């Protein structure tokens, strides 16, 4: 059992109700927690979360369906389908042909974060920065003085002039949002509001010249990872704290990690689906854009779930 205390910050805390004797966890409980922490680490963005779930579903024998193809599904079959690479539906059909009921679990893949603006390059006082926009209901103060990396999806044109998309994750600290030194801001420990437009531009390093382009940095990173990139067309990127999930407390009764809202529910729903041995119909849906109202094609207010059920 997990009792959750969520703060919409760079790092959240969950209270664990797992320990049998208040100190030691069973091997199964520890294995489950290790899997959860690995899933969170591998999922810095909704695109990576869906890719992580796809990997586990493929290993479990699930077959991928495509919206552009005619579906041929069988009783007892196990399938999944994605939309925008950020929303996923996975389901197991009952052994009997007639579907009388379906057990469903819902979650969402997105979390509050700092997203990179379309034209983010800023040079100020000899330093290179990137402009960001707050996504979702985030606490802003905890984003300061963190080691930040960058991840998301990049759309490119390859050598054959085809548009392709790639996941990208720098997996190392490349930026930070430094706090102002106390002797320059004597009121820092009192009431202090954060202006996202002036206080949150992310620091990349010393100024890199007027011709600096984030798209060039993305292209170089993708090429270093074996992708053919002729031109970066567009991107959807967000910064994340590189600090790994950890069990903290004298008895390790707390799980501290980013994106617990709502990757925790995604992981619980996925593992429940994969571990189930029932012959009844089951479905897991993990939507995107919950943090901004779900009003999108891949959000919960969209038609994705209904179209899959139909």
Feature map (PLM): residue ranges:
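N-terminal hydrophobic/helix-forming segments and targeting peptides
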Residues: 2-310
